[in-house]
Regions:
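C-terminal regions of RecA-like/P-loop NTPase motor modules
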Residues: 2-36, 43-51, 265-318
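A generic local structural motif
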Residues: 37-40, 60-63, 207-208, 243-244
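Phosphate-binding/switch region of NTP-binding enzymes
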Residues: 212-301
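Residue-level signature of catalytic and energy-coupling elements of molecular machines
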Residues: 83, 151, 253
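Glycine-rich loops and low-complexity Gly/Arg-rich segments
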Residues: 107-112, 173-178, 244-248, 303-309
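Phosphate-handling catalytic cores of nucleic-acid transaction enzymes
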Residues: 45-48, 56, 68-77, 86, ...
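P-loop NTPase motor core
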Residues: 144-248
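Conserved P-loop
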Residues: 41-143, 147-148, 158-162
């Protein structure tokens, strides 16, 4: 049996090794994990860019984001722009103009297994969630992600509406049934206004994941088309157009940009030029931009287009 002196010596050697490897002794700080989290926040590059871009088809919505990614000289080498590309507009535009391999165009649609419907709406919803979570995991591992563009957000609204009717309320068996909301066939109508909260909750799961990306220093852009909010066969009032997304979305996005195209004609009613513009309808990070309109592109008959883009998306203006 070892003597006490040997035991003490051995204990001293153990304590020396413990001190050298830096083993932490338990402490009574109940907020230790929060302090560590706060420390990690100081190393995150914050952009605070979360913008909604809306307008009619062909007004340059996706183009201004792709151009910003291409022109931003401050971005980290090998940075990636991910696109959740519902209408494949980002993929086609990148292929035709930029051909940038660091633009990743994700197809969010999951094909249906039956002949009756082309898409599996519940599977598509889950696939979108998985793509966003994957991007978050890449950022957390240190992969440089410049931004995420969700293109064709009106399709996401449709997916959430159909899943509410198919999965949550059991009013339809597939996407075709879900599209028939007349209540005339087997598919029933949504009976209570409160039921629409289910659709909205589904929709804003994407909001939650987008905010998580913004907190990690990633720019997030939502792009959608327009819809008429007062159409009536009996009413001659001017049509009121609004972005095609869940109606509370305007409250959740810090920046809103409306894209327009204005045509100019000559005395013979022939098209002379088209001016494409971006107008800020909301900007919490730079209120001086609100109601400002900036020219993005001008096309003139018989001439090459003049492209200006929207440098605000990468030069620090926002």
């Amino acid at each position: 049996m070892a003597g006490f002196g040997q035991t003490v010596k051995l204990q001293q050697e153990i304590e020396k090794v413990v001190d050298e490897v830096g083993v932490q002794k338990p402490n009574n700080d109940p907020y230790a994990s929060l302090r560590a989290e706060q420390e990690s926040m100081s190393h995150i590059i914050k952009t605070h860019s979360f913008a909604g871009i809306f307008g009619f088809d062909g007004t340059g919505k996706s183009a201004i984001v792709l151009d910003a990614f291409d022109k931003d000289e401050t971005k980290i080498n090998d940075s990636v722009l991910h696109a959740v590309d519902f209408d494949n507009g980002v993929g086609m535009l990148n292929s035709a103009i930029y051909d940038n391999p660091n633009v990743v165009s994700w197809n969010p649609w999951k094909m249906g297994s039956k002949d009756r419907t082309a898409y599996d709406y519940p599977g598509t919803h889950q696939r979108v969630m998985d793509i966003m979570k994957y991007i978050i995991s890449e950022v957390e591992k240190g992969v440089p992600v410049w931004g995420v563009l969700v293109s064709g957000l009106d399709s996401w609204l449709e997916i959430c509406t159909n899943n509410m009717r198919i999965i949550d309320l059991g009013l339809a068996k597939d996407g075709i049934d879900a599209a028939d909301n007349r209540g005339a066939g087997e598919a029933k109508r949504v009976e209570r206004q409160s039921d629409w909260a289910i659709r909205n909750t589904r929709f804003h799961q994407l909001t939650k994941l987008s905010r998580d990306l913004v907190r990690l220093g990633v720019r997030v852009y939502w792009e959608t088309h327009m819809r008429s909010t007062n159409f009536s066969y009996k009413d001659d009032a001017p049509v009121v157009w609004q972005p095609e997304w869940e109606k509370k979305t305007n409250n959740y996005l810090p920046t809103l940009i409306r894209m327009d195209a204005t045509n100019e004609y000559n005395d013979e009613d022939e098209l002379v030029s088209t001016t494409y513009t971006a107008t800020y309808t909301k900007c919490k990070t730079n209120p001086s931009l609100v109601n400002q309109t900036k020219t993005v592109m001008v096309t003139t008959t018989g001439e090459e287009p003049k492209w200006y883009g929207l440098p605000d998306l990468y030069d620090g203006t926002l």
